[in-house]
Amino acid sequence: MAGQHLPVPRLEGVSREQFMQHLYPQRKPLVLEGIDLGPCTSKWTVDYLSQVGGKKEVKIHVAAVAQMDFISKNFVYRTLPFDQLVQRAAEEKHKEFFVSEDEKYYLRSLGEDPRKDVADIRKQFPLLKGDIKFPEFFKEEQFFSSVFRISSPGLQLWTHYDVMDNLLIQVTGKKRVVLFSPRDAQYLYLKGTKSEVLNIDNPDLAKYPLFSKARRYECSLEAGDVLFIPALWFHNVISEEFGVGVNIFWKHLPSECYDKTDTYGNKDPTAASRAAQILDRALKTLAELPEEYRDFYARRMVLHIQDKAYSKNSE
């Protein structure tokens, strides 16, 4: 059975009150149009960003192919001055390059010290902060990070989930975003937080037969659009044009639920991590049994988890 292809709903002129009281509790992706983002959507041209962003050194992903794979790491990390990154990312062919003349670039901005500081565009790029308004769709104390993203045209980012809620602000350019529900995790062939299925448009169903069952939610983002991505929703992003985006991440759960060492917003909540460690110990204990018994008691455990932990709410 082929999975459903569903459009992500779009709404225009949503107020803070509408979002927080009626839309946010639904925990579903949503494209918001007509949000006041400040002058960034018209000001952030290649020339302007190069001039204002200056020579600040940034760490980037460089890939010889458009389809980036975090599992096999088919890219390298390099450092460039910000102005050079912007100019190179806007090009199709490069006179100067690291890997090949048609290599792709991807910036995911970091904190000053990524081991202890979260990304915040207002701190790392202070001359740009006056150009952009963050939608006030969460309480200030819930704020986690704001991440600057710059992508070459055609670049595809692997399917993954984040543990924070986020707003993806498409400042310039155009992106296609495909999302999958957390309820469809069993069809996505996960390795950690990421899916092994790279080619989501033409997947190898002999290798990944269950992928066809995953429901696919899709939207196109243009300059000024804002996509709400709830925590745990998987997303795959293609930059159809050179573009600049900003992600704003915030905490859906109380702060004490999150790993305090997490500066990226992608470590599972501490209770989930503890449960996974307990499960690993249980599996080692099960391994002491012969296969026939191990299989039987593993199935009983799965049924017990489904009964006690799966949500009874239908989507």
Curated annotation (Swiss-Prot):
One of its GO terms (cellular component) is cytoplasm. Binds 1 Fe(2+) ion per subunit. Belongs to the TYW5 family. Pathway: tRNA modification; wybutosine-tRNA(Phe) biosynthesis. This is tRNA wybutosine-synthesizing protein 5. It comes from the Eukaryota. It is an enzyme of class 1 (oxidoreductase). Transmembrane segments: none annotated.
